[in-house]
Curated annotation (Swiss-Prot):
Gene3D superfamilies (UniProt xref): archaeoglobus fulgidus dsm 4304 superfamily (3.30.2170.10)
Family matches, as HAMAP family: UPF0215
Annotated protein name in UniProt: UPF0215 protein Ta0042
Spans through the membrane: none
A Pfam match: DUF99
Family membership: Belongs to the UPF0215 family.
InterPro entries: Endo_dU (IPR002802)
Length: 205
């Protein structure tokens, strides 16, 4: 049992690491909540955040939206709300990237700790965290956003012959790879975020 007496040395000092996430049992009907945002224009104060609830095979069950502040810090709260609006049945949160509505940065570890649902943040190979950090330091001077970005440890995912990247919380890389692959019909990106992206583009018109 994790956290039990046997997990600690006799001296009483805790282990110098936290146990990593265990291999996940992935059932065919597992629900995924796909997250992406809407485009916004210069001068906009808000943007839409879209949540698409679907089964692993791509069957869509529900869509919801929530407002977030441009360059704000409320995206974690908005994702929690989308999780609640869709009935708390999602067993995976899958999002497109880590930054929404400009530099509204999702803290995926904090999100996982709040809702206890594994988080997969998928993005294109070659995305530069350092460029994002430089822009935040220049325009926003927000150390918390910088801290979140520096804490990320992206892993490489091979999907349909493509290489993409993912940041993970509460899930191991092998399970994330399987979920991404099984939720992809064609191309490099899974249906959950592909559809959330399409809906977001419509709402942003």
């Amino acid at each position: 049992m994790i956290g039990g007496r046997d997990d600690y040395p006799e001296s009483g000092f805790s282990l110098p690491f936290e146990p990593g996430p265990r291999r996940m049992q992935i059932k065919r009907g597992i629900r995924i909540l796909g997250i992406d945002d809407s485009p916004f224009s210069r001068g906009d104060r808000e943007s839409n955040l879209v949540g698409v609830l679907m089964r692993m095979d791509g069957y869509v069950e529900m869509m919801e939206k929530e407002k977030i502040q441009v360059d704000g810090d409320d995206v974690n709260r908005a994702i929690e709300n989308l999780f609640l609006y869709t009935g708390r049945v999602a067993r995976i949160i899958m999002m497109s990237g880590i930054s929404f509505a400009g530099f509204n940065i999702c803290d995926i570890d904090a999100l996982y700790q709040r809702i206890r649902v594994p988080v997969i943040s998928v993005f294109e190979q070659g995305g530069s965290v350092e460029r994002m950090i430089a822009a935040i330091e220049k325009h926003l001077d927000d150390p918390e956003k910088v801290r979140i970005l520096r804490s990320l440890k992206p892993v490489e995912i091979r999907n349909n012959g493509y290489i993409i990247m993912a940041n993970l919380s509460g899930i191991d890389a092998q399970s994330a790879q399987e979920i991404i692959t099984r939720n992809t019909i064609r191309g490099k990106f899974p249906e959950a975020i592909r559809l959330a992206d399409l809906v977001g583009k419509i709402l942003g018109r």
